[in-house]
Regions:
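Membrane/wall-proximal cationic-aromatic binding patches
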Residues: 28, 37-38, 55, 60-61
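Active-site-proximal beta-strand elements of phosphoester/diester hydrolases
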Residues: 39-49
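A secondary-structure boundary/capping signal
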Residues: 26, 44-46, 76, 106
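Short beta-strand micro-motifs in enzyme catalytic cores
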Residues: 26-28, 41, 88
């Protein structure tokens, strides 16, 4: 029982103190352009789920322009994680506004995020 409790504590610490700040850029190279064509760098952003208190996430997103130097930005939505997350999302994405891009709404962008019990699916 002690080991189970320690394992649960380790999972909680990992989820709340480490993983939620562990953002990453995944790079993939696709050979789809004709030989000799200049590279096309695409930045795909999705599922930001921004809340107003997530300043670390906001700073990280603001730096994407200089880290990636994209030619095209594709944002596939779910940018909002809180009803007051609109301004933080706009501020975070502001450095990317001069770059051509495409945006698609996610469900969290159309409706205010609702609080849900994360264990509800276990009760079905």
């Amino acid at each position: 029982m002690l080991y189970l409790g320690l394992a649960a504590l380790a999972v909680i610490i990992w989820a709340t103190c480490i993983e939620r700040y562990w953002f990453a850029i995944k790079r993939s190279e696709l050979k789809v352009l004709p030989t000799g064509s200049p590279d096309l760098v695409v930045l795909h952003i999705s599922d930001i789920h921004m809340a107003p208190w997530q300043r670390y996430k906001q700073r990280w997103i603001r730096k994407l322009n200089t880290k990636v130097n994209p030619d095209l930005v594709i944002n596939t939505g779910d940018n909002l994680g809180h009803a007051r997350g609109i301004n933080p999302v706009l501020e975070a994405l502001n450095p990317l506004t001069g770059i051509p891009g495409v945006f698609v709404n996610g469900s969290n962008d159309l409706y205010a995020p609702a609080k849900r019990n994360p264990f509800q699916y276990l009760l079905r």
